[in-house]
Each structure stands twice: as C-alpha cells, then as structure tokens.
Amino acid sequence: AAIQEADTVIGYVTYIRLVADLLDGKEIIRKSMTEELDRAVEALSRAREGKKVALISSGDAGVYGMAGPTFEVLLQAGWTPPAITLETDEAGHEQRIVGDGIEVEIIPGASALNSCAALVGAPLTHDFCSISLSDLLTPWPTIARRLDAAAQADFVVALYNPKSGRRTRQIVEAQQLFLRHRSPTTPVAIVKSAYRRRQHIEFTTLDRMAEADIGMLSTVLIGNSNTFMQHGLMITPRGYANKYDVTGDRGVKGGERSGRSLSSGLNGWLQSLHADHAAGMSVADLAAQYRLPVDYIQASLDAPLPEPEVSKSRRKTPAASGSPEGNA
C-alpha cells in the first residue's frame, strides 16, 4: 500500500526491479549499492516538495536497511517529527517544539534471517544474533571481535553480506574464528534469494562452509552446540529437554520444578559457585570452568547468596461429609 500511494519511489536498482509491477505512473529514482545517503537526500528533497516518497529496502528497513541512514540525513538537515513534542532546557523549563511537517513512517518487513529460517526449519528457536561481514563501513577488527564473542557465547548466528566479488576472504576468516569455539560438524544453512525466483538452499557443516556457493544475496545461518539436522530440517532446541522428559510422560525431571528456574539457573548456579569456592576452587579456576570474566566471578562470590526458593502450599480444606472425598 505504501508503494502504491507514493508519488516517488527511490531505491537500489535491484530492489526497484523487484517491485516493478507496482510502479506504473510513478517517478522512479534508481541508485547504486553505495549511494544509500544519496537515496535519503533525494527522499528528503522530494518530501519537501510535498510528494509522498517510498524509500525501499529489501527485508526489513530497520535491519541493515535504509531506516538508519534516512534518520541520520533528516536529523543532520534539522528535521524534527511533525507532532508537537516537549523538551526540557538546561534550566529545567519545558519547551514546545513544532516539527517541520515531514512525516516519516518505518514499515516493518521480514528480515532475511526470518525468511531464511522459515525455509530451513527452526534454527532460531533459542538465542541468536546477526552479524554483517561487510567491512565497507565497519572496521574488520570490530567485526572479528563480534564473531569471536558470538561464537564463544554459543549463539546461533545469521551472517549478512557474507561474500561479494571483491570481498571473498571475510567468510573464510569468520569460519576460522567459529572453529576456535564450535565443532567442525556444526550445522550450517546457506540460503540465497529467499522466496525469490532464484532461491537456492544448501546445507553443510562449519568445516565446509567456506567451500559453499555463497554470494551477496546469501544469508548464512550457523547453528549452536545443540542445533541438529534431521529430515532436511535445521532445528535448534528451545531447551525443554533440560527440564522435562520429552520422550516419556512429559513429566518434570528430578531436581527441577515446573514454572521455576532450572536448578542450574541463576540462584542454583550461585549456590554451586559458592560451594565450589568453599571447597577450594580458585576464582581463576571457576572463571575458566564457566568461561566467564574473573571479576564477574569475584563479584558473584562477594555478593550475598539469594534466599533459596520455598515452595508454597495451601492447606487442603477437609471434605464435607457425604462428598466423594469424605466417603473415600
């Protein structure tokens, strides 16, 4: 609807082509891959002329899309939202600020990680993150630190912009960083052009990931230590097997309680931490065991232990005479 209502449509050449059937009678402004700021400037210029402008992205505009660059350009140009807002000056007095009349609406879409996950099974059922391998705007050491941290923390990871004609080594570097923390057989799914005409899906493993057919239109999903492949599906368990007998009567496992934190949750872990330390384990050894910072372990030991959870039970009212319970 937003594109159909627009007077002007601005976007990357490929994205314009994807919505060609919606563009009859509209002003179309095509820009190249590296002209994101120019697109935002053009959108502001046309909006100031009184036109409705659709600035299109693939996936979700707020995930590696045009939402961020657009707001940066608008704010640098002195734009404020059209609604009357209140701000407080240095003296504590409220000031009324009226915007310049240009309304901006971010319309959410399905990001590549959502679309790709739906095509390959359920890989994002537990904690995950996304990392772009594009170093056009981000220094490589920053990207590498994020990759290493995500790999060590056992996130399922969606890699955006994994490879291009010029950027071919980044995916290899990412693989090497992940192999420092993950099994070589960790499941990997590579989805190219999700839900488009040339859609292609390939399943592989972490040790062979860099050999796969990967390009700019690909999204790479790397599983965590519990992710598995079965019947052509990539699945990351949510963790129910930690608490429940998922193969038998679905009952709660010994030592666990339904609706309460795991025995290895925060309170249980703190109890174990204190017990291990009292038994002679050093702070450094505990930090190494849990792969957590030494100062965090020390702070956890310095803090008072939380009160243990106590199960609350209500006194059962005696059954009235003549009831089934009373006759039992």
Regions found by a protein language model. Give the residues of each.
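Class I S-adenosyl-L-methionine
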Residues: 1-104, 210, 250-260, 267-272, ...
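Short, acidic/turn-prone active-site loops that include or flank metal/cofactor-
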Residues: 13-15, 30-38, 110, 129-137, ...
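Class I SAM-dependent methyltransferase SAM-binding "motif I" and its flanking Rossmann-like core
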Residues: 65-156
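A contiguous loop/helix-start segment that scaffolds small-molecule binding in enzyme catalytic cores
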Residues: 152-265, 271, 312-318, 324-326
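Short amphipathic helical patch at the helix-1/turn junction of helix-turn-helix
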Residues: 276-278
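Helix-turn-helix DNA-binding elements, focusing on the entry/boundary residues of the two helices
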Residues: 283
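Short alpha-helical "recognition helix" segments of helix-turn-helix
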Residues: 286-287
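Short, solvent-exposed alpha-helical "recognition" segments
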Residues: 295-313
